[in-house]
Structures are given as structure tokens and as C-alpha cells.
Amino acid sequence: MSEEESPYQLTKTFSNPKNNKIGLAIFLIGAFINLIHIYKPKGPSNNPTKRNYHISFGPPGKIRWFPLGIRKEVRSNVSGREIIIKMIITFILVQTTLITLDLYVFGATGLGLILSWKLFEVACANPEDEALLAERKQRLKEQREKKEQKKEQKKEKKTERRKKKKL
């Protein structure tokens, strides 16, 4: 069959309301999945037979995404398993928008899900987190300076020893 006879062709418009509704539904499902955070709180539970899970929007703490990982900067209890599950679900949902055969719906849904990942990242950032980060950076800077000073002192001692040996 040639391209003109094919019943399935990619379109580049938002003109089909059915496709738009499918894309919107997939986006809402994906955004909800990306924004929800299920975690088990630390400490003893009141009922040992019942699993005590909490659901919140966004992770508590501040995290930064990288292409192949996550850097937990301040008190974040996001697990690697949770991230992998979210990535797989997001990928599958974006690919399911291709059933609409509408490139605009596919692109808009994919972009929306990517933005929901970013929203998940910054959902629960606290002003205190910035102060903690600044304090941690300051401590690291001081540690580096101390190490450099120790290295310089060792070099000076070595040069002094060499001078004494030559004399």
C-alpha cells in the first residue's frame, strides 16, 4: 500500500477532539504519578501488622535530577526504585500517545510530563534547605582549604629537610 492509501497517517494538528482528550487524559495520569510520593516514615509504627505508608505531593527535601541519577541534597527520602518506576511509567505513557497518530498531542503530552518531573523536583523546597546547603558548602570549602594548607606545610617541611641534607 502506498502512503495515500494507508488508513493511518500522522497528523500535525490539534483538530481531532478525541485525540486531544486521549492526550490530556494520559498527561493527567502521568503528572499525577510523577508528582505523588509514597514513603514509609522512619520510626516505630502504632500497628505492627499494618504497613504505614504516607502519600504526599513532591518529595520532602530538595533533589536535583541528572540524566542517569539523582543527587539528594537535603533530607530527601526518594528511593532509586521510585525514580526508575516513575521513569518507566512516564516513558510508556508518552509512547501511548502515539496511538493518536497526532504529533502535536505526542509532543505536548511529552513536554507536559517532563515539566511534571521538574515540578516534582521543586515541590517541597524549603527556605531552610537553602541555608543548610550554604552551610554545607561553607564547611566543604573550609575542609578543602585545610587540606591545601596541610599539603603546603608538608611541601615546606620536605624542602627544609632537603636543604638541611645538602648542608
UniProtKB/Swiss-Prot annotation:
Can you tell me which residues the record assigns to a coiled coil? none
> Compositional bias (Basic and acidic residues) spans?
136-159
Provide the alphabetized UniProt keywords. Membrane, Transmembrane, Transmembrane helix
Q: Where is this region: Disordered?
A: 136-167
What superkingdom heads the lineage?
Eukaryota
Where it sits in the cell: the answer is:
Membrane
Query: What GO CC annotations are associated with the protein?
Result: endoplasmic reticulum; membrane
Segments passing through the bilayer: 21-41, 87-107
Major place of localization? Answer: membrane
Q: How does it sit in the membrane?
A: Multi-pass membrane protein
Protein name according to UniProt: Uncharacterized protein C688.12c
Organism whose genome encodes this protein: Schizosaccharomyces pombe (strain 972 / ATCC 24843) (Fission yeast)
